[in-house]
Amino acid sequence: MEVEKLALKYALINAIEHDGKANPKAVIGKILGENPELRKKAREIVPIVNKIVEEVNTLSLEEQKKKLEEIYPEYFMEGTKKEKEEKKQLPPLPKAEKGKVVTRFAPNPDGAFHLGNARAAILSYEYAKMYDGKFILRFDDTDPKVKRPELIFYDMIIEDLEWLGIKPDEIVYASDRLEIYYKYAEELIKMGKAYVCTCPPDEFRKLRDQGIACPHRDEPVEVQLERWKKMLNGEYREGEAVVRIKTDLNHPNPAVRDWPALRIVDEPNHPRTGNKYRVWPLYNFASAIDDHELGVTHIFRGQEHSENETRQRYIYEYFGWEYPVTVHHGRLSIEGVILSKSKTRKGIEEGKYLGWDDPRLGTIRALRRRGILPEAIRELILEVGLKKSDATVSWDNLAAINRKLVDPIANRYFFVADPIPMYIEEAEEFEAKIPLHPDHPERGYRVLKFEPGKPIYVSKDDLSLLKPGGFIRLKDLFNVEILEVGDTIKARFHSHEYEVARKNKWRMIHWVPEGKECEVIIPEGEELIIRKGLLEKNANVKEGEIVQFERFGFVRIDKIENDKVIAIYAHK
């Protein structure tokens, strides 16, 4: 197909999908991406595309559609990009009404949140958005003893959610709501649906396991209220009294029988409330009250937490409330990657991990640092969807999604790991002009200069391709014959033409004339492998940028210090 016809086709498609205005850069990228043989003619193609895009943009949207139907009717059979994306929507929610759906994500700020947590966050947010509803971020921070919240993690979670494209309509801190929990606890005691138990924990456990009532269970409400006041005013110490919700003492799951709702923590030293409060609600009590108070209509909950609903329904039944629709999903994990907050914390404290963003981990911060885009995480989670079974994805699954997203945006550079000098005889000075991206000539070029008498550097990884008497092509430079291989390599210029190398099936390797020091950190299971080498001297990379080191892989530039570049390997 002639370039003009291709340009017209893609200009019309791009215009129709973008309110009648085509983008010449996008059209050029599409033409070269699907027709790589035209890349060598990129300079000639650009003015042709610019002219056709200008003409297409003068047409009305209806005229553009009519013209495209004449030259490419298949487009309308396939459906537009937008229509295709809409087909990938999540399944409808039960009992969901437009404008009335309220969802929540309730992380404990005792550590950075990870891919597994992100599933509930993304599903909750996407469904709220789908139904023009409301998404609440509720910090579940009422355990100042076992899962102690820390101020740094409140901010981390908000930042990570924003990076994932999740903007809460409301942020709620459970630790700000203790007076509300106290009010409902007292009401339940007055209703005879809760009581204050002062049994030693072991003694209560024995009674519970036998389905026998605790001696305090059926004592008068007045006695219970007196004990409740003692809990609040400090007359009971930690472990001496607990508020329990009355349930079925013969329930098949002993953990459901008269479960604990509030307990005493003598010196909570809470990061937000200090030691102001000493009676703290447990998760199921605080969560049940807040879901009602905040008007939550739909809860997305891991299958492993399904018993929470059983406990919480007792409170809803006692108050005559309607329990939110609960959607259970399985766990999500990555093969060989640690998601456990307790294991991560222990590893950090022992010096095993560098921090919550150590690239070996599965925290959102670690994935971000490694070069995974937020869109890749969202796409992965939406693909898995609401499956009730546990899902373990391989790193390759996530990498494949990410590769598709980063490939069009990542500029290309040469990085030579473990460099070995190569001296080339009989070669004249030559400048290799290489596009920053093969599909986007409009981004510009990088120039690598070969100077006679000076070495270039090739990677030790390519030594097996270098045999005396053999030939190779130096990518975007010229072809050489290998003369000697040792601590240095000697070669002789052969020819410039790529066709010569292609015809003879000579292997192609990358190189740098001189370079800036560069280290690539490669996560491999529990290890961090460091590859040292040289990056193109004039590589204009910035911290946080994702680029491709050709023949090596996609990396994220982590740090630049004193002209030394440190990158983290993402994937091939």
Swiss-Prot record:
Signal peptide (UniProt feature, chain positions): none
Annotated localization: Cytoplasm
Superkingdom of source: Archaea
Function summary: Catalyzes the attachment of glutamate to tRNA(Glu) in a two-step reaction: glutamate is first activated by ATP to form Glu-AMP and then transferred to the acceptor end of tRNA(Glu).
Name of this protein: Glutamate--tRNA ligase
One matching Pfam family: tRNA-synt_1c_C
Family according to the record: Belongs to the class-I aminoacyl-tRNA synthetase family. Glutamate--tRNA ligase type 2 subfamily.
Organism: Pyrococcus furiosus (strain ATCC 43587 / DSM 3638 / JCM 8422 / Vc1)
Catalytic activity: tRNA(Glu) + L-glutamate + ATP = L-glutamyl-tRNA(Glu) + AMP + diphosphate
Group of enzyme by EC: ligase
Cellular component annotations (GO), alphabetically ordered: cytosol
A Gene Ontology biological process term: glutamyl-tRNA aminoacylation
The UniProt record lists the keyword Aminoacyl-tRNA synthetase: yes
Keywords for this protein: Aminoacyl-tRNA synthetase, ATP-binding, Cytoplasm, Ligase, Nucleotide-binding, Protein biosynthesis
Family matches, as InterPro entries: Gln/Glu-tRNA_Ligase (IPR050132), Glu-tRNA-synth_arc/euk (IPR004526), Glu/Gln-tRNA-synth (IPR000924), Glu/Gln-tRNA-synth_Ib_cat-dom (IPR020058), Glu/Gln-tRNA-synth_Ib_codon-bd (IPR020059), Rbsml_bL25/Gln-tRNA_synth_N (IPR020056), Ribosomal_bL25/Gln-tRNA_synth (IPR011035), Rossmann-like_a/b/a_fold (IPR014729)
EC number(s) from the headed UniProt entry: 6.1.1.17
Placement of sequence motif 'HIGH' region: 107-117
Any one GO MF annotation of this record: glutamate-tRNA ligase activity
